[in-house]
Design a protein with these regions (language model features):
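Domain-level signal for soluble alpha/beta catalytic cores
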Residues: 1-274
Length: 274
């Protein structure tokens, strides 16, 4: 894949590209324009999913750039406002997930980095997620990734979203916002970022274990999964691999220590179904 909006815009009818725009410093972004009603033509990700699933015996998570980010990070030349565009895009995402489910996918993550920069639009994101989840089987796990921002402006409202898991970027800020998610109680599953996706320094296994245990301050073990803070494509491949290898080792060690009673969890367990 290339840039997270560009990849999908090339596959959605109604988008066109007119050249790059400057975003910061000398960096540019090939920002697409919506010039007509968006339409679903053919699958965006089924081939990618089927290939990935064929080379592993583990479950495969399929990330999809969310409709709000696709709308917010594009020039809108066809719709009344961002909300109307995002709603139509959400319906297309729903169609794509249906195709992925037919292909065997059971774990989908919606990436909405734009929510971190425009938190007042959380209601639009919630409406989009309702459209995305409509008719999707209950055994399909839907996660939502929101990049680093002022999480206090969207929590606890995000708990009303129809998703099973929230993937949050907290290692980047040294967990300075961890307390945001302690009150009121975090009732969904938490996918905690435990390695920094923007720093080429590779965290050690003991460091990652400490980060994982921070998640246990928010949710019990059965509600906690671990992940990198964000996508690792901007890191050198060797660095990304080392970070992920250490993450896996740290998670296994924490899981074993929990099983052996070496780590005490003081908070009461609340399941995501409650």
């Amino acid at each position: 894949r290339n840039e997270m909006v560009e990849f999908f815009a090339h596959r959605i009818e109604g988008y066109e590209f007119n050249g790059p725009v400057k975003v910061w410093g000398h960096n540019t972004f090939d920002k697409p324009s919506v010039v007509s009603e968006v339409e679903y033509d053919e699958s965006w990700l089924v081939d990618e999913y089927e290939f990935t699933a064929s080379v592993t015996d583990k479950p495969v998570k399929v990330p999809i750039t969310g409709p709000y980010t696709l709308a917010n990070w594009s020039f809108n030349e066809a719709y009344e406002d961002t909300e109307a565009l995002a709603h139509d895009l959400a319906d297309l995402v729903n169609e794509e997930i249906e195709k992925l489910v037919e292909a065997g996918a059971r774990y989908v993550q919606i990436d909405e980095p734009a929510l971190a920069t425009t938190p007042d639009d959380h209601a639009i994101v919630g409406d989009c997620l309702e459209r995305i989840a409509d008719g999707i089987p209950e055994d399909v796990r839907i996660g939502l990734h929101v990049c680093y921002g002022d999480y206090s402006r969207i929590y606890p409202e995000i708990l009303e979203f129809p998703v099973d898991e929230f993937d949050l970027e907290l290692a980047n800020g040294d967990y300075d916002q961890l307390d945001v998610f302690k009150d009121p109680e975090f009732t969904a599953d938490l996918a905690l970022g435990v390695v920094d996706a923007h720093d080429a320094d590779v965290e050690t296994v003991p460091e990652i274990k400490e980060n994982i245990q921070k998640g246990l301050e928010v949710v019990p073990p059965e509600q906690l999964t671990v992940s990198p803070d964000c996508g690792v494509k901007l890191l050198p491949r060797t660095v990304a691999y080392e970070k992920m290898a250490n993450l896996v080792q740290a998670a296994r060690e924490v899981e074993q220590e929990l099983d052996e009673g070496e780590i005490e969890v003081e908070r009461s367990a609340v399941t995501a179904d409650d």
